[in-house]
Swiss-Prot record:
Segments traversing the membrane: none
GO molecular function, one term: carboxymethylenebutenolidase activity
Family in the record: Belongs to the dienelactone hydrolase family.
Record protein name field: Putative carboxymethylenebutenolidase
Native organism: Salmonella typhimurium (strain LT2 / SGSC1412 / ATCC 700720)
Top enzyme category: hydrolase
Keyword match Hydrolase: yes
Keywords: Hydrolase
The keyword Hydrolase belongs to this UniProt entry's keyword annotation: yes
Catalytic-site annotation from UniProt: C147, D204, H236
Listed EC numbers: 3.1.1.45
Catalysis performed (reactions): 2-(5-oxo-2,5-dihydrofuran-2-ylidene)acetate + H2O = 4-oxohex-2-enedioate + H(+)
Length: 270
């Protein structure tokens, strides 16, 4: 795993805010595992409830640009307390370690841009397969992702026909294409296999509201089962409780909407 920094967070995520949340793990089992994927062993963090009856609904948690650091691991723990098997794969592991980058611009150019979407989507397929062999219900597969992972969440909803529900937090919707990123969410609006909930900040300078409206129009034109919620007072990464831009009210509302979305479409065990 990349979470070797003493704080548990990638250096580029600094400065850390005092609002960070740590979920107690007394009622859950959590740890690091290795998932075979495309000839490699992919590190991943998982969390599940200690007490469970039968196979668990599965949520794949897709990292921010900072990798599977403490915030993403805590997201997994929170989902485990809600009755899910949550898995966060380390999707940069072939290309490098986020802890080797001191700031966001060099992290983006030196690592994130080198990771092909096609590789990521295939890795997520192997995560789903691993979950089905390790106590997860293959018929109740869901995904959520944040920032970089929010964009991937949209793409995966168009990639895997077995997916039941997806929730994308402030993921990029439009942009320039490249060999590693040939499509963006706006390009796959007609191909969604599962209902997608998008959660966005009205003050997000990295995702202009014009791009959110463009995505809404594409979804309407495709008659897609999707919804986009914009929080007017929130900026980018408003759920990242370890960062200064954390917006508690929006984060809490988004979390509740995510759980309701999963319960409605994902077949969560009651």
């Amino acid at each position: 795993m990349t979470t070797t920094h003493p704080s548990g967070f990638a250096p580029a995520a600094s400065p850390l805010a005092p609002t960070m949340i740590h979920t107690p793990d007394g009622a859950i089992s959590a740890g690091i595992t290795s998932i075979p994927s495309q000839g490699d062993d992919m590190p991943a963090y998982y969390a599940r409830p200690k007490a469970s009856d039968g196979a668990l609904p599965v949520v794949i948690v897709v990292q921010e640009i900072f990798g599977v650091h403490e915030h993403i691991r805590d997201i997994c723990r929170r989902l485990a307390l809600e009755g899910y098997l949550a898995i966060a794969p380390e999707l940069y592991f072939r290309e490098g370690d986020p802890n080797d980058f001191a700031d966001i611009p060099t992290l983006l150019s030196g690592l994130v841009a080198k990771v092909p979407d096609s590789q990521v989507l295939a890795d997520l397929d192997h995560v789903a397969s691993w979950a089905s062999r390790n106590g997860g219900d293959a018929h109740r597969l869901m995904i959520t992702g944040f920032c970089w992972g929010g964009r991937i969440t949209w793409l995966y909803a168009a990639h895997n026909p077995q997916l039941k529900a997806a929730v994308a937090w402030y993921g990029k919707l439009v942009g320039d294409t490249s060999l590693n990123s040939p499509k963006h969410p706006v390009d796959i609006a007609t191909d969604l296999n599962a209902p997608v909930l998008g959660l966005y900040g009205g003050q997000d300078t990295s995702i202009p509201q014009e791009s959110v409206e463009t995505m809404r129009q594409a979804l309407r034109a495709a008659n897609a089962k999707a919804e986009i919620v914009v929080y007017p007072d929130a900026g980018h990464a408003f759920n990242a409780d370890y960062r200064p831009g954390y917006h508690e009210a929006s984060a809490k509302d988004g979390w509740q909407r995510m759980l309701e979305w999963f319960a409605q479409y994902g077949g969560k065990k009651g």
